Amino acid sequence: MDQDIKTVIQYPVGATEFDIPFDYLSRKFVRVSLVSDDNRRLLSNITEYRYVSKTRVKLLVETTGFDRVEIRRFTSASERIVDFSDGSVLRASDLNVSQIQSAHIAEEARDAALMAMPQDDAGNLDARNRRIVRLAPGIAGTDAVNKDQLDTTLGEAGGILSDMKDLEGEIHDYIEKFADDTALVRGVAWVYNLGSADGGETVITINKSTRTYAVPYIEVNGSRQEVGYHYSFDLETQQITLATPLKAGDFVMVMTTESQLPVETLLASSVGAASIGTATGETVEERLTRLYGHFVHPETYGAVGDGITDDRVALQRSLDVAYENALNGTGPSTVRWSGDYMVSLNPNSLGVSGELAAGRSALCIRPGVSIEGKGTVRLDPSFTGSQSGAVITNWAGPADDCSIKDIRIYGGKDVATGTGITGILILDSQRVVISDVKVLNSTAGGIYLRKGATEGLYGCSFSKVSGCTVDNAGYIGIQMERPYDNTVIGNTINRCEDNGIDVFGNVNDATVTGIAQSTLITGNNIRDVLNGVFIESCGNTNITGNYIADFRSSGVIYNRINSAANDNSLTSNVLIGASGASAGVSFKNSVGYCTVASNRIQNSDYGIRCVGGGITGLNILPNTMKNIAKTLLFVEARNNGLVKSRMSTQFYEGAQVGGIPSNTSPRGVPHRFPSRLSYIVDIQPFWATEQGTREDNFERAKGTLASITGWGSKCALYDTIVAGDTVVSLNSSSVAVGEYLEINAEVYKVTSVSATYAVVRKWTGSDYTAGDYAAVIISNPSYIIRRVQWGEQ
């Protein structure tokens, strides 16, 4: 009988590296344990030992209390390395691996049987010079006795054993249960039909009191049969289906794997998760470690997550632990919020001058910390007051490399008694990422990246707000103060009482362009706000590809407080106003140097609006406009309202009716801010899709004054038809009172008309004055008629 143990080896302690003398298919089939006569400890790979090479391991733990190191191969009988499917290609290498796995299982089963208590060649149980421990006292005459029984018997007999009874045993099973190193799974040999088959059987039912979980192999008359080739095993029916029927008298031994403990007890134990495999080949315990070992969970620190209990302290603790880990490199720096957490304002939160009032914020994020998960943070609506604060902020200082992803924040608007609490406010930080966050019902702003109290020109730098939703905010949706290389992309902003997106860079004591660099605002969907995007006293922004609808004032506005809003670009946006909206684009208070191109502007009084004077350097390339109630390009009635600018031909969907919408505000009106558009302003007429005159600068009509025979073949008379006034050869069917005539580069105002003439008075520098102008209105000059609005707007 072969007594060579091949799959288990023990070494004395003292060294740190030990050889693996057997081959194996996977490292998870190799178990390293520390053992002694009365104790055993199974070690974990990576944390308690590691592989130096394929055939050598190194211990990483102390061996105190143990005298041996055991290395054992334990190949899974249920987790196949190779799984064959119908129709697949059969490769020799796969067959070899499958065959090796079966062979390994068989070797391990044989070794386990030998190590448990095998039979010798005479059929006797052989303890192999080892103690049999935990032996119950014998009862029947053929039972073995333990040492206590023997000592008692010897004592009662005065220490003299006069007679020894021969121990006789009858073996009823082919082999007893044997244990692996976890003492949970037992391999048992079972003999079919008392060792003699009836003949013809193709199905064998294992009828044992304990449940069989696998059949690694069977032997028929000593010939080994492999699972998957010679037979299959059904766990539910406990039946073995044979490929070849048995013959009468065949001796069939079945090697089974069964549980000593109930499955429920096994799975509920500390090693239960490690006993369950997954489709990826890892155990449930390994999967949980991989998923949750990378996160800090507030539930660890007492968070309830029911949306009612105040979890602020637990959430803050999770943030603090993540920061300590990030700082020391000792653990996960990502916090996973997956519950529904109520948080109150922290009375100990610090204030930041001009940004946060003390005691008005809930949670503080620190550098290197990430927040993610599908969780919800609800601000306790019982707060009062109106001072500024935030649900999540960084009152302790810059929070470089922080991120907030995929959570919801409810601010309590419409139910809270207080106001002023923004959803997220990050100050003076670099590489901030806020993505897929929903800020709902904020009593102030949604998501802010701002300049705090620290030194330096800029607020947050190299940062991004993407894929977020801000809905029903009491103030601004997304705001950046003094940004540097920041991006706002793909966000949805709805129902803000102020601006959808706001960029602020004012410098109080400067008149140059405000502070902002490389700001990209793109792909955002903004609806039902006061202004869609507000660029306040700063430049270097690129606003492109946004959809802005239902704004109440302007789709995009550029404004100066102290420093200018220059050097900007506005392209390819859709700007659709709500009823009564002022303008698609507004420029206010000496700003400019902006390219406006390829935008769709719709449903507002003005397409582009310039107010406050000094609007400079606008490059208005073709845009599409529709439903503009008054003017495509409005310039406020003041000198130098728009200078050094140009407007290309605009595409207007619709018709101009009665000169409305006008192409621009009146240009060149001598009596009303003649330099309203000045210093090289080039304006091209617009183009309309519907029939109409497509007037430019309120030019209603033009022609040549006709000579009248009754006037001596003249086209103008003085003091003849109307005393003290000049009349021209136009009548009430061609010109109206209040309209203006341009004749020979002079401007005249029509003061009255009849069926045969029109009375005109000339602009003389201070007023339209009656006088003799017939002497210069000669030789049938050409004329231009401009509408009344030309002189009044």
UniProtKB/Swiss-Prot annotation:
Keyword Nucleotide-binding: no
Temperature-related properties: Optimum temperature is 25 degrees Celsius.
GO biological process, one term: symbiont entry into host cell via disruption of host cell glycocalyx
Activity-pH behavior: Optimum pH is 6.0.
Entry keyword set: Degradation of host capsule during virus entry, Degradation of host cell envelope components during virus entry, Host-virus interaction, Viral attachment to host adhesion receptor, Viral attachment to host cell, Viral tail protein, Virion, Virus entry into host cell
Chief localisation class: virion
Entry's Gene Ontology cellular component terms: virus tail
Compartments reported by the entry: Virion
Phosphoprotein among keywords: no
Matches recorded under Pfam families: Beta_helix (PF13229), Phage_T7_tail (PF03906)
InterPro entries found in the cross-reference section: Beta_helix (IPR039448), Para_beta_helix_rpt-2 (IPR022441), PbH1 (IPR006626), Pectin_lyas_fold (IPR012334), Pectin_lyase_fold/virulence (IPR011050), Phage_T7_tail_fibre-like_N (IPR005604), Serralysin-like_metalloprot_C (IPR011049)
Family note: In the N-terminal section; belongs to the Teseptimavirus fiber family.
Complex and partners: Homotrimer.
UniProt function note: Functions as a receptor binding protein (RBP) and probably mediates the attachment to the host capsular exopolysaccharides. Displays a depolymerase activity that specifically degrades the K47-type polysaccharides of Klebsiella pneumoniae capsule, which allows the phage to reach the host cell membrane and bind the entry receptor.
Record note on domains: The N-terminus anchors the RBP to the virion. The central part and C-terminus probably binds and degrades the host exopolysaccharides.
Protein's name according to its UniProt entry: Depolymerase, capsule K47-specific
Source lineage: Viruses, Duplodnaviria, Heunggongvirae, Uroviricota, Caudoviricetes
